[in-house]
Amino acid sequence: MAPPRPEETISEDLDESSGSSETEQPDIQTRAPKRRRLSASSDDSYVAPAPLPTLSRIKKKGAEDAKPVASAGQENPVLIRDALEIGLREEASSFSALNVAPWLVGSLTTLAVRKPTAIQKACIPEILNGKDCIGGSRTGSGKTIAFSVPMLQKWAEDPLGIFGLILTPTRELALQIFEQIKAISAPQSMKPVLITGGTDMRSQALALAGRPHVVVATPGRLADHIKSSGEDTVCGLKRVRMVVLDEADRLLSSGPGSMLPDVETCLSALPPSSERQTLLFTATVTPEVRALKNMPRAANKPPVFVTEISSESQGTVPPTLKQTYLKVPLTHREAFLHVLLSTEGNSTKPAIIFCNHTKTADLLERMLRRLSHRVTSLHSLLPQSERNANLARFRASAARILVATDVASRGLDIPSVSLVVNYDVPRNPDDYVHRVGRTARAGRSGESVTLVGQRDVQLVLAIEARVGRQMEEWSEEGVSIEGRVVRTGVLKEVGEAKREASGEIDEGRDVLGRKRNKLKKVR
């Protein structure tokens, strides 16, 4: 039988699957005995949009900048769209009230997850009732549990073959979901498998052929298996009953670097949409994702359930997040970053520094090491084993600073992070939402600092218009970043560190100064 055309595949699948979520993934350590909190209740209060900021505000700080201003007609914002229409009640304050199985309630309690968040209250009952779902909620609000709990409960009723498939855009997020699935399903001895790039395909093919219960994968690597590993390896996918697109906005986006062709290949190996549930979750519900609700559906399929928690403004950030900007000259950005990380208020904070390019991230890590910062990195130039090791070091506080590209901006849940620095201003406001969502998670406080140069003002204005709040100018009592850069010899110190780091890269050495053999990169 000829495989369905790409447009038929994605249309058939997504009409049933409408949803998305940059889910915040609870932090689960690789060490099984020490189970960490997966999620805590999130504050889903409404954040009113502010009027479009002006260029003069960026040039000169104003006291009124940080104050959000409510728009007319939004005095009674709808926090749960469609959820209230089906009778969602506030008294559903426990997982038992959501009809979650006792063994799952016990497992969540063991992991210190006792009360469902708003996205979990809205989605879990509807998914258990067999509906396709589109779920939108801010970062850190518990979207992973919102789809994993009903998947595990329905699997336990019919634990035969590959029951669920979870697709996610990054390897690190896939690993985090995989570890979380293992932790929650521990009482039932579920057999999940992780399929991502950067590791041996042969061992993955054997794992797929062994009929695991849940497959957590990145689209590119799973598509490679579907194309090249043989029918015997991937035939189990034809029994999938539930598919999840986590970070659906990224998976379904078009343009350069699009994952859509690989997603279509993955969906073509699954049963038709009329024979399975499709769940889409994201922190940024795009119009394209939202429109999937109204696509044609099979006669036997109930309507798609759509809920957007506190998403009435296009992309929301946690209300406990303090958003700031710091004006920096183009030629001294590294010096300003070094001083910012060394101030009395920031010198002990676990921090993530986001860059737009892998080469920038590599250079910054090497430079900051020479400036005595405890730093590691996460980007696509690193082999997968090193990426995993670096992330583990940061989680364990062996490194205080993680320098990363947007590969670390989606889904990763590291509760200790209290500072996010945008070294490069993201070109897409949605990327900003995901970046700053690495802090201030699950009701905790956090701060983001965006380094703004002369050419970045319009990008900052677009970000502020998107999140509905204005950034404050960064300040710390008794601290002048510019003064410290100019008067304390920082420029010379940082300049020397940058030159040494650049030379190390040119010589082909790793961050520890060891000569590195150029090996063929494993996909």
UniProtKB/Swiss-Prot annotation:
Please list where the region (Disordered) is annotated.
1-52
Enzyme Commission code: 3.6.4.13
Q: What is the enzyme's main class?
A: hydrolase
**Does this entry carry the keyword ATP-binding?**
yes
Assigned keywords, A-Z: ATP-binding, Helicase, Hydrolase, Nucleotide-binding, Nucleus, Ribosome biogenesis, RNA-binding, rRNA processing
**What residue intervals hold the motif DEAD box?**
246-249
Q: Give all residue intervals belonging to the Helicase ATP-binding domain.
A: 124-303
Example of a GO MF term: ATP binding
Span of the annotated motif Q motif: 93-121
GO BP, one example?
A: rRNA processing
Alphabetical GO CC annotations of the entry are:
cytosol; nucleolus
The record's section on InterPro entries has: DEAD/DEAH_box_helicase_dom, DEAD_box_RNA_helicase, Helicase_ATP-bd, Helicase_C-like, P-loop_NTPase, RNA-helicase_DEAD-box_CS, RNA_helicase_DEAD_Q_motif
- The principal location of this protein is nucleus
Subcellular localization is given as: Nucleus, Nucleolus
Binding locations of ATP: 137-144
Query: Which catalysed reactions does the entry list for this protein?
Result: ATP + H2O = ADP + phosphate + H(+)
Q: Which Gene3D superfamilies match?
A: P-loop containing nucleotide triphosphate hydrolases
Known role: ATP-binding RNA helicase involved in 40S ribosomal subunit biogenesis and is required for the normal formation of 18S rRNAs through pre-rRNA processing at A0, A1 and A2 sites. Required for vegetative growth.
- Family from the record: Belongs to the DEAD box helicase family. DDX49/DBP8 subfamily.
Protein's UniProt name: ATP-dependent RNA helicase dbp8
Where does this protein come from, organism-wise?
Aspergillus clavatus (strain ATCC 1007 / CBS 513.65 / DSM 816 / NCTC 3887 / NRRL 1 / QM 1276 / 107)
From the UniProt record, report the name of the gene that encodes this protein: dbp8
